[in-house]
Design a protein with these regions (language model features):
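A short, active-site helix/loop in glycosyltransferases that binds the activated sugar's phosphate group
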Residues: 1-24, 31-34
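Short beta-strand->alpha-helix junction loop in the catalytic core
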Residues: 8-9, 26-37, 53-56, 84-87, ...
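Short, structured helix-loop element that forms part of the nucleotide-activated donor/catalytic region
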Residues: 11-12, 78-105, 109, 190
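Conserved donor-binding/catalytic core segment of Leloir-type glycosyltransferases
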Residues: 41-58, 63-68, 79-82
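Aromatic "clamp/platform" in nucleotide-sugar-dependent glycosyltransferases that forms part
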Residues: 111, 130
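Short hydrophobic beta-strand element within catalytic cores of glycosyltransferases
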Residues: 147-150, 160
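Conserved acidic donor-binding segment of nucleotide-sugar-dependent glycosyltransferases
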Residues: 162-163, 167-174, 183-189
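A short, well-ordered alpha-helix in the C-terminal region of glycosyltransferases
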Residues: 176, 183, 190-205, 211-217
Length: 230
């Protein structure tokens, strides 16, 4: 049995002849601990947040450009970025980020083991990634009652019901990200209505216990720990 976290990857492997379709099973990512990442109150100031390694493939350039575009018209809005800069070809450097921080466009934070403290500070979570398995950060933000802006890309599109729990945008399109940010700003009631639906969707589809049950079922393994903590 071969386990995939999204149907796009499954289809790619099957169509390439790497695995037979009858051997494949799809689970909903790695799941999210809905107890740890529980619904939290929203901040007073509208705040957008991205948590990611600061890599091109995660959509960091699109996020920064979208923040810049929206900040010009809505200087009161807050934009956060949590993630380390790495010395690899696909990553922005601290020097690349510096102008955005110095101009007050974004607030950049390093690494932390208390990511939920940052989710609590945001109104909407943003991940303009080019491709994922299933993005755990999106699941965590959903579980905490945050509406999502992410891409219509493999792994990402499965996490959002477009228009109900958040919005899907095209890959590599900063203007589309900015447009959806603006929609939340101009219609702030969407933050709570889509956020509540997002939390419900996380519990229905992505809770870690449900995902682990599916995984064990596919692999014919009996679960001994029903309360896995992730």
């Amino acid at each position: 049995t071969v386990i995939f976290q999204n149907p796009d990857d499954r289809e790619q492997f099957v169509s390439s002849g790497l695995v037979k379709s009858e051997k494949c099973r799809v689970v909903n990512g790695s799941g999210v601990n809905t107890n740890r990442f529980s619904v939290a109150d929203y901040p007073d100031k509208i705040t957008f947040f991205m948590l990611s390694r600061v890599m091109y493939s995660k959509g960091i350039r699109e996020y920064l450009r979208a923040c810049e575009l929206v900040k010009e018209k809505h200087p009161e809005v807050r934009f956060m970025l949590l993630g380390a800069c790495e010395n690899i070809q696909d990553s922005l450097s601290k020097e690349d980020l510096a102008p955005y921080v110095e101009k007050g466009i974004i607030e950049h934070f390093g690494e932390t083991d208390r990511v939920e403290d940052y989710y609590k500070q945001c109104s909407v979570y943003v991940l303009p990634s080019y491709r994922e398995g299933t993005p755990r950060t999106v699941l965590e933000a959903m579980s905490m009652g945050r509406a999502i802006i992410t891409t219509d890309a493999p792994g990402c599109r499965e996490t959002v019901i477009d228009g109900k729990t958040g919005f899907l945008v095209p890959v590599k399109n900063a203007e589309a990200v900015a447009e959806k940010m603006t929609e939340f700003i101009e219609n702030p009631e969407l933050i709570k209505t889509l956020g509540a639906a997002s939390a419900e969707y996380a519990r229905e589809k992505f809770s870690v216990d449900k995902v682990n049950d599916d995984m064990c079922c596919h692999l014919n393994i009996e679960r001994t720990n029903k309360y896995a903590v992730v």
